Structures are given as structure tokens and as C-alpha cells.
């Protein structure tokens, strides 16, 4: 499928190409070539994705001992290439290891990933400021009222498709919005840092129970650090699969993060609140119904995972 394209632009001889099943939005292929193992990626084209910035950022991270992707240059000396349809793509060296399933991390891997996240935040303080992630724009756009309107549209879409289970989830969320706490977040008091932007277990490569790499830095941005701390925990810890949160394990996770990262009292006070707010006002069900991506089912999995957490908390 890609033999001529990759040979002309990179001089690679492909023996085998396997479609990657993880990751939402992007179209990713694992390549076995005469020259080695590589990853061919057609990145998502959303507003939060910045594939043009990824090679430089990853080179900086590798210089500071963060196991990030190494990109190949094409025949013109650039990192970004186009196929015959005008789709942008990159080629990266492939790290050894596999991507674990959600909520399957051992405690050792869980704490190792927390420590690495703290190190990423510390290292990236020396990098130029990245685009805004969860910030003032997010809170202006993503309000409970707008979530309510989106959920009502998604209920209608679910019922049209006969998806009664998702319709029930959405109706529960509509009820939640009516009684949701009136939390306010002071961005000037939250610790915000340059970060991966989408740091969780689906972006890990692991071998022998340890991290070998963190992949997919296309959505790197500035986030409140507690959002990424909490999100990475709830997708990795086995206890969270049914929506439960082991507070003792979460405390150990935060402690491991703080080996390199820093959290204020205000951060800790809002650790749960900020994440719960974000998953309450973001309509992943709507993303699923609107998407045409081959792997759009991941949006539905994210939606149901978030709903279980909210149902357990509220």
C-alpha cells in the first residue's frame, strides 16, 4: 500500500504494514522495513493537533532523557510529507514494546508513569510556551449550559441509531448537569505547564513491565498539571475500570509525580474537581456520532469510561 510512497520519499523498503488499533483520530501504521521498524502516521487534523511542532519538541525531550519519538527526514530534508491525496504524514522510528490496555497497569508501572509525567513537566519548563490547552478559552466554550444542549442533540442521535444504552447514559448526564456543583477555577492559582497534552496509558510503550517510550506528542500544549495527573491515573489504575477511585493509590501516584513535579495546596484541592468538570461538560458521545474515523469507537469507550467515573462520584 505504501511501498512506492515510502521508497520515493524516505528510501525505505517495506516488508509488512500493520494498521495500529489504538489512538483516536489519527491513522497510524506499524512498518517492518529492511532498514528497521518504523511508524507511519497520518495525524488528526483537529485544532489541538500540531504535527509540524512535534519533531522539534521530541528532539528536545530526548536530549533531556525523556523517551520521545525520533523522526526521519524525507528526501527534501523535512519531517512532514504529503501522499498523493495531499494527506500529511510523518515517519518515526519504532520503539520496542506494546501499548497496555486501559486500567491494566501494575502499581510499579503506575508509579513509574507518574514520576515520568512529573519529569516531563519539569523538563518542559525550559521549552518555549506551547499552545493553550485547558485554559481560559476552554472554560469560555465548555460550560454546563452548552454541554446540556450538546447532550440533547446526542440523545436524539443515539435514539435514531438504536443506541439505547448511550441514550440512557446521556439522559443521566443531563440530570447531572442540573445538579452539578458550581465550581470555579482560578487559572492564576492552578499550576499550568507545558506538557504532552494527552498523557495516558494509550500513549505508553512498555516492555517487561516498564515504560520504553511516550508516543504521540502532536497535541502538546499548556494544561493545568492536575488535569493530566488525574486523567493519567484513572485510565491506568485497574480500580478505575468500574468508576471507582482508590484514594490511597491515588495519593501514592501524586507522591510519585511530586518527585519531579510540584503541586500547590490549591492544585490538590482541585485535583478531582477539575477533571470531573472537564468530563462532565465534554460530550464524547457527540464526538463518536460525528466522527467518520475508522477508529471512532474509541470516543464511545472514552464516553462510557467518563460516565462510570461520574456516576461513582455523583
Segments and roles (model prediction):
Residues 226-262, 276-293:
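Active-site activation/catalytic loop segments of kinase-like enzymes and analogous catalytic loops
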Residues 281-314:
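ATP/Mg2+ or Mg2+-diphosphate-binding catalytic cores
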Residues 26-32, 39, 179-227:
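Active-site acidic catalytic loop and adjacent metal/ATP-binding pocket
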Residues 9-32:
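ATP-binding glycine-rich phosphate-binding loop
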Residues 33-131:
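ATP-binding pocket architecture of kinase catalytic cores
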Residues 107-166:
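A cross-family kinase active-site recognition segment
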Residues 2-4, 129, 149-197:
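An alpha-helical support segment within catalytic cores of ATP-dependent transferases
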Residues 89-102, 153-156, 277-293:
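A glycine-centered beta->alpha junction motif in the catalytic cores
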Amino acid at each position: 500500500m505504501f511501498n512506492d510512497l515510502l521508497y520515493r520519499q524516505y528510501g525505505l523498503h517495506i516488508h509488512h504494514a500493520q494498521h495500529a488499533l489504538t489512538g483516536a483520530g489519527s491513522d497510524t501504521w506499524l512498518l517492518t522495513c529492511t532498514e528497521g521498524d518504523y511508524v507511519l502516521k497520518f495525524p488528526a487534523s483537529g485544532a489541538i493537533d500540531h504535527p509540524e511542532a512535534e519533531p522539534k519538541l521530541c528532539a528536545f525531550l530526548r536530549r533531556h532523557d525523556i523517551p520521545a519519538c525520533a523522526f526521519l527526514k524525507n528526501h527534501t530534508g523535512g519531517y512532514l510529507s504529503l501522499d498523493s491525496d495531499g494527506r500529511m504524514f510523518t515517519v518515526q522510528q519504532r520503539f520496542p514494546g506494546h501499548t497496555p490496555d486501559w486500567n491494566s497497569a501494575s502499581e510499579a508501572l503506575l508509579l513509574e508513569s507518574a514520576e515520568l509525567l512529573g519529569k516531563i513537566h519539569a523538563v518542559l519548563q525550559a521549552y518555549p510556551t506551547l499552545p493553550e490547552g485547558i485554559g481560559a478559552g476552554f472554560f469560555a466554550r465548555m460550560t454546563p449550559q452548552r454541554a446540556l444542549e450538546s447532550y440533547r442533540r446526542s440523545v436524539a442521535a443515539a435514539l435514531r441509531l438504536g443506541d439505547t444504552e448511550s441514550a440512557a447514559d446521556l439522559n443521566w448526564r443531563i440530570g447531572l448537569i442540573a445538579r452539578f456543583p458550581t465550581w470555579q477555577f482560578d487559572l492564576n492559582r492552578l499550576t499550568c505547564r507545558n506538557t504532552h497534552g494527552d498523557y495516558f496509558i494509550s500513549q505508553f510503550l512498555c516492555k517487561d513491565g516498564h515504560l520504553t517510550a511516550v508516543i504521540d506528542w502532536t497535541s502538546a500544549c499548556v494544561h493545568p498539571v492536575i488535569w493530566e495527573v488525574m486523567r493519567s491515573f484513572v485510565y491506568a489504575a485497574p480500580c478505575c475500570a468500574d468508576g471507582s477511585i482508590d484514594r490511597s493509590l491515588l495519593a501514592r501516584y501524586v507522591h510519585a509525580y511530586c518527585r519531579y513535579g510540584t503541586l500547590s495546596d490549591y492544585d490538590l484541592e482541585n485535583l478531582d474537581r477539575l477533571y470531573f468538570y472537564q468530563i462532565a461538560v465534554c460530550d464524547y458521545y457527540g464526538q463518536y456520532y460525528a466522527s467518520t474515523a475508522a477508529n471512532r469507537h474509541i470516543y464511545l469507550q472514552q464516553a462510557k469510561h467518563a460516565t462510570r467515573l461520574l456516576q461513582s462520584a455523583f
